[in-house]
A protein has these predicted regions:
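Short amphipathic alpha helix immediately N-terminal
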Residues: 88-104
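N-terminal interaction/assembly modules
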Residues: 1-86, 125, 129, 133-142
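Short alpha-helical "recognition helix" segments of helix-turn-helix
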Residues: 108-113
Length: 142
């Protein structure tokens, strides 16, 4: 994976994290509609699928899995932010931040910096050569 591809993970991880939170919220709302079983003397099947305890156990398992996936996405985002922070100059840092964290197009980055797109692309190339990749979970010991 190139450094550029590594930095591009940020926006994907951010989108995936938002999707995961939406899935958890949708499941929470669905579970809010689960009702307790009313027991009566009437015969009924013994299908445990409708048992409230089983439903909540499945919900907890679902949420735990989603939270693991969510935390993984956050770790990727954190690692990319730390990687960008290894840029040797403030200008390189700012260009990488605008492009990969804020997701701006090259023309918008150039406008924000007040330089030409070609100049920004040149500085970006140098920044990619000089940054150090920080893997998720790695402590930043620069």
């Amino acid at each position: 994976m190139t450094k550029k591809e590594y930095l591009q993970q940020y926006r994907r991880a951010q989108l995936e994290a938002q999707i995961i939170l939406g899935e958890i919220e949708a499941e929470r709302q669905r579970m809010a509609g689960v009702r307790a079983i009313i027991y009566s003397d009437m015969p009924r099947s013994h299908d445990t699928e409708h048992d409230l305890a089983d439903a909540y156990a499945k919900y907890e398992h679902f949420v735990a899995n989603k939270l693991r996936a969510y935390n993984h996405r956050l770790a990727i985002m954190d690692a990319v932010e730390k990687t960008i922070a290894t840029a040797p100059t403030r200008l390189q840092y700012q260009i990488l931040q605008l492009r990969y964290i804020e997701g701006l197009k090259w023309d918008d980055v150039a406008e924000r910096i007040g330089k030409t797109r070609q100049w920004v692309n040149t500085v970006h190339g140098k920044a990619l050569q000089q940054i150090r990749i920080i893997e998720p979970g790695e402590t930043d010991t620069v």
